């Protein structure tokens, strides 16, 4: 993101002068705040090459389609600025950035970050197109889709491998995902979308008070990306485990997990008592020892399960945050990859 830093020298460009000297309504018809205008112009300049829009990046492709629909295909910097300004308000809200004029310096860079994270998040929603039996995707979106697939391959516990061996390979086979594959892919999109929303919020409250994206609707206050780690790890996501058979299976699996932990060197923590003198080996003391042994194994199994589930959740969220950052960079990759190298 350093190459997009907004400083006073980088903003003194002919395009910026065009926007700031004349009323915005006379140039693009926008009512955006001055701070947002500056961000729009900076992004537009990043997308230009030889006086024309470079549509080799995901954001460039999206703008090219929008400009073509408005009869502005092949337009110059003014048309690109107008199209980008329109796109931002369509995706992020009519009043996005309305209160940003009170900020300067770091606040402007925060607004840039909010714009890019917001656009990346909105583009996730359009990656898959519903079809009979599943969804399809466009070759134009492969730069972003590959990042999502890599995230899924990096977290096989959350996203088991498809028949093709990997999610990256799945995208190479054809442009169709069946119902199960679509569900897994949408789950990944939700997790990464949440991270993009978090990063957008962390950038500051400038756009949030002016009609930004707000809280992602995919997650409620009582929901969790990972679900119930104990239930999910042993009986499968969405299974309450309330029936007697399921409870027995759960206990058995926890005891087995505890035994594996002990054999791996974990120990039970509490030694099993030896029978007292005068107590029959087949009497009450043996039953007590067995209860203690099973209880210890059950506890070790529970500890191991919760530890693994918690670690998995942390790893998934950390991985998602990294992919979210890569997706933001990918938006302009076609035009600035050499500069970022």
From Swiss-Prot:
Chief place of localization:
secreted
Q: Where are the sequence repeats?
A: 210-216, 265-271, 276-279, 311-314
* Database matches in InterPro entries: HrpN/Z, T3SS_HrpZ
Keyword Kinase among record annotations:
no
| UniProt keyword list | Host cell membrane, Host membrane, Hypersensitive response elicitation, Ion channel, Ion transport, Membrane, Repeat, Secreted, Transport, Virulence
2 X 4 AA repeats of Q-T-G-T, as annotated region: 276-314
Q: Which domain of life is it from?
A: Bacteria
GO annotations of cellular component type: extracellular region; host cell plasma membrane; membrane
- Impact noted for substituting residue 102 to N: In strain: NV
Q: Does the keyword Cell division apply?
A: no
Q: Where does the secretion signal sit in this chain? A: none
Biased composition of type Polar residues is found at 216-225
- Disordered as annotated region, ranges: 199-228
Effect the entry attributes to changing residue 221 to S: In strain: NV
Q: What are the boundaries of the region 2 X 7 AA repeats of G-G-G-L-G-T-P? A: 210-271
Q: Which GO terms describe its biological process?
A: monoatomic ion transmembrane transport; symbiont-mediated perturbation of host programmed cell death
**In UniProt terms, what function does this protein have?**
Harpins are proteins able to elicit hypersensitive response (HR) in non-host plants and are required for pathogenicity in host plants. HrpZ forms ion-conducting pores permeable for cations. Such pore-forming activity may allow nutrient release and/or delivery of virulence factors during bacterial colonization of host plants.
What is the UniProt domain comment for this protein?
The glycine-rich region is characteristic of harpins.
The protein's assembly and partners: Homomultimeric.
- Family per UniProt? Belongs to the harpin HrpZ family.
Task: Please state what the protein is called.
Answer: Harpin HrpZ
Q: Organism classification, top ranks?
A: Bacteria, Pseudomonadati, Pseudomonadota, Gammaproteobacteria, Pseudomonadales
């Amino acid at each position: 993101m350093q190459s997009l830093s907004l400083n006073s020298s980088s903003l003194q460009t002919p395009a910026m002068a065009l926007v700031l000297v004349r009323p915005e309504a006379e140039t693009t018809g926008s009512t955006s705040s001055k701070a947002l205008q500056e961000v729009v112009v900076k992004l537009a300049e990043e997308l230009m090459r030889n006086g024309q829009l470079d549509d080799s990046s995901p954001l460039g492709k999206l703008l090219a389609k929008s400009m073509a629909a408005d009869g502005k295909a092949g337009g110059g910097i003014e048309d690109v600025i107008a199209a980008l300004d329109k796109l931002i308000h369509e995706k992020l809200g009519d009043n996005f950035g309305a209160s940003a004029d009170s900020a300067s310096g770091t606040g402007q860079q925060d607004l840039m970050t909010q714009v890019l994270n917001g656009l990346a998040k909105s583009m996730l929603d359009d990656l898959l197109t519903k079809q009979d039996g599943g969804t399809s995707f466009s070759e134009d979106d492969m730069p972003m889709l590959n990042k999502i697939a890599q995230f899924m391959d990096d977290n096989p516990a959350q996203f088991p491998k498809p028949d093709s061996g990997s999610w990256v390979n799945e995208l190479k086979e054809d442009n169709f995902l069946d119902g199960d594959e679509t569900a897994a892919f949408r789950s990944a999109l939700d997790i990464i979308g949440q991270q993009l929303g978090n990063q957008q919020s962390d950038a500051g409250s400038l756009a949030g008070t002016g009609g930004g994206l707000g809280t992602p609707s995919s997650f409620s206050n009582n929901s969790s990306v990972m679900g119930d780690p104990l239930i999910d790890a042993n009986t499968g996501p969405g299974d309450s485990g309330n029936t007697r058979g399921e409870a027995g299976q759960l206990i058995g699996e926890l005891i087995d997990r505890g035994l594996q932990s002990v054999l791996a060197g974990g120990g039970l923590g509490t030694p099993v008592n030896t029978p007292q003198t005068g107590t029959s080996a087949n009497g009450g003391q043996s039953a007590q020892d067995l209860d203690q042994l099973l209880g210890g194994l059950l506890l070790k199994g529970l500890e191991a399960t919760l530890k693994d589930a918690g670690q998995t959740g942390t790893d998934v969220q950390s991985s998602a945050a990294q992919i979210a950052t890569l997706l933001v960079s990918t938006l302009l990759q076609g035009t600035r990859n050499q500069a970022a190298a």
